[in-house]
């Protein structure tokens, strides 16, 4: 047989009797989506703690249905994060601000005493004489907002006369600081992987945390009442209408009355909260029964610094839980931003800011999200994965009667309705072509996102008409806000407004966006209502079943296998 040369073989390909058709070879959607997802993952993976990328977490979540996260996995990740990786970016940004402000312990003590003196003078409506070098609002705000949360040791270790009382105080402070840190780890690592699927156990944990936040704010105001009583001889009156026993008993009754399914998913969280409450009870007995240390001139500088630092620490912790909710966790909350437990916690925070906002500054969710960038990075990556798996159009839905239906309908924004950024409490995720709409009606379940396929790194900004939670703010540098003075009745719910977005006088309610500049007003457009999407339930869980059976070695391969099954 004659052997053909290479050139003759190449010509043989075109000399066949039947014509050969050639297609245009281009990367398909699967390859492009995987490449984009891999590039996004490589750019964001360094900003996330190692606990969120552990193989044991991924394998357990793949074996768990209904988008649940077992509490044993959460505690395992929280205890394993010894170096505080979950808050490393946030701590680095805060420490950089503290270093830029040149805040030493002695300087912080001066700011605390001076801030409390100005707070007392303002309440008594008398002129205040500032100490030399302490009238710097920017440095004072940073010291009051961040310093106790970064430094584990108390500023003053001897606020009492007796040595045994001081030792007990230092011990209680360390226990409180460690307990708050562990609960923050728990909150950070309790998120599920699927951001488009409801998570009932995550919602139950969030509701328990909101009740816990409400209790901490009430106890903080009780402690400030105790300090004011000792300093100015009770000229102001109490700000907490119930006793300290009832403050803690209300939360313990809530934890004791949890249903069996909620108790199964929050048992270890309840134990951690009870441990913190016991430390707060011990330190309450110290401030109530023990003798406070005074200077030669009768001034109680050390007790003032200790109590202000403790209340600042608790306020920072409560803001962490609330701000992380507005930066994405509200996606899994039953009822969304209209959840009654969330609104109760926000109302208590507003009450705290109304009475003590001049002493303890607050940070809005948008500024907090810039400091804690790992939350935004994780949600960008999770949204990209969901868009690759489920397609370009995302609908947050619940399972009802064997179909998937939207949790609630988007709210219509009336043409000409003005946006006022003073009244705002919304998520600080990047905005997209759609918005996460929320409602205040009781019968609606959660928020509905609409995302564009061309924006993988976009989670819509929430538009929340929080009329009964409105509060005037005076903006300070760095995203830190202090509430303006308001009458006492402004913290009560506004009953003159109805659920249809209008007040009793017919005027439209205000819809705001925290990502806007306060000096700008966004032009309003009509948001079209999206019809419900009906999909078979089996198609939602086919990807999870595939991941359970295949057990791919990498996250990208797992996503590709899910996508192949979904497209077949």
UniProtKB/Swiss-Prot annotation:
Pfam families reported in the protein's UniProt record: Herpes_UL46 (PF03387)
Function of the molecule: Abundant tegument protein. Trans-activates the immediate early genes.
Keyword Ubl conjugation appears in the UniProt entry: no
Any one biological process term the GO annotation gives: regulation of DNA-templated transcription
Record's subcellular location: Virion tegument; Host cell membrane
Keyword Phosphoprotein applies: no
Membrane topology, record value: Peripheral membrane protein
Polar residues bias (residue ranges): 489-512
GO cellular-component term (any): host cell plasma membrane
Low complexity compositional bias, start-end: 521-530
Similarity section: Belongs to the herpesviridae HHV-1 VP11/12 protein family.
Organism: Gallid herpesvirus 2 (strain Chicken/Md5/ATCC VR-987)
Start and end residues of each stretch annotated as Disordered: 484-530
Matching InterPro entries: Herpes_UL46
Entry protein name: Tegument protein UL46 homolog
Record keywords, A-Z: Activator, Host cell membrane, Host membrane, Membrane, Transcription, Transcription regulation, Virion, Virion tegument
Main localization (coarse): virion
